[in-house]
Amino acid sequence: KVLSDIGLRVLGIERKEICNNLRHYMKNMLMHSYLSYMVLDPEDPILAREGNEYHPRIEELIQSYSDFAQKFNLPIKTHHELVDIEGAKDDFLLSVRDGEGRTSCLKAKRVVLATGSYDEPNLAGIPGELNGSVQHYFHEWEHISDQRVLFMGGGFSSADGIVALCPRNTILWVVRKSKDAVDEMLHLQKTKWGQHDARLVNTEILTESQVVSLEDNTAVVQTPDGQKTWNYDLCYMLIGHRPAQDLYTRLLNGNLEFDEETFESCERPGLYLVGALAKKHLEHIGLTHNLCPDNEGVRYIDNIRSAMMQEFNCSGQ
């Protein structure tokens, strides 16, 4: 939208649906940032109805972004996956594969990579972590009950997942953090992040601990007091994600460094890294006047806009 507004001919390519990364999470999960930090349309109806300090659910944010694309008739090819990029600045040739496996080619002068960082889960390098009972995304969960569920990872994804599951299941949460750090996070979950009714029941927390094996649906946990074992039915290993390694090895020799002012790739001029690839997340892309404090008063999409205006001598609108 921003680049179209300065007169550039722009095409978006999305390998699945719009907001594919967000669809990996449970649709009722509350976002920790305010909607006004993330919303694209200043006239967004949810923002108008709920106000600047509203914590949206995942499904509401997906709807907001989908409505934005439709409202401005953004040219986005869904179910098209970027396979490779040949050529150089001003003369790129993109290989794209559609949902039926057919490959086509597109020409471009510049390429903005905004593929996110959730393609591949981080692994712990322990036995059993690739078992079918080990999940790396917290998505479908409403049907889970009367199970022994192990959570690995000390972030809010684990905390949110445990709050959702603990009323009907038995939970073990293994974290490397200290007890004070976990208590602080749970306090923030109930206060700053809007989940005022969050409550842990049926949950044991092992702090300053780590799982060393998941084989045969038995977790072996190294704790400050020695090793413990815990049989589980389902494990959520929520220790982060990373970009598709194969793709960025091909495109950028695995080098994700970029110019902080323009976001242009250091490895391959003409390619730009934005969003989670540049470690600038949803709250850094909003187009309203309500800027997230964490982004130091800068709307990062403006850097891309300024760089492109200079490259193509655009005046903007």
Regions found by a protein language model. Give the residues of each.
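Glycine-rich dinucleotide-binding loop and its adjacent helix/turn
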Residues: 57, 104, 113-171, 256-268, ...
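A conserved FAD-binding loop/helix module that cradles the flavin
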Residues: 269, 273-317
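Short hydrophobic core segments
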Residues: 104-118, 150-152, 230-241, 273
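Glycine-rich FAD pyrophosphate-binding loop
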Residues: 1-25, 170-182
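A Rossmann-like FAD-binding core segment of flavoenzymes
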Residues: 73, 77-80, 84, 91, ...
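FAD-binding beta-loop-beta segment adjacent to the flavin cofactor pocket
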Residues: 27-29, 249-273, 277-283
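Glycine-rich active-site loop/strand segments that organize a redox cofactor
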Residues: 13, 17-63, 278-284
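Short beta-strand to alpha-helix junction loop
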Residues: 46-67, 77-78, 178-192, 285-289
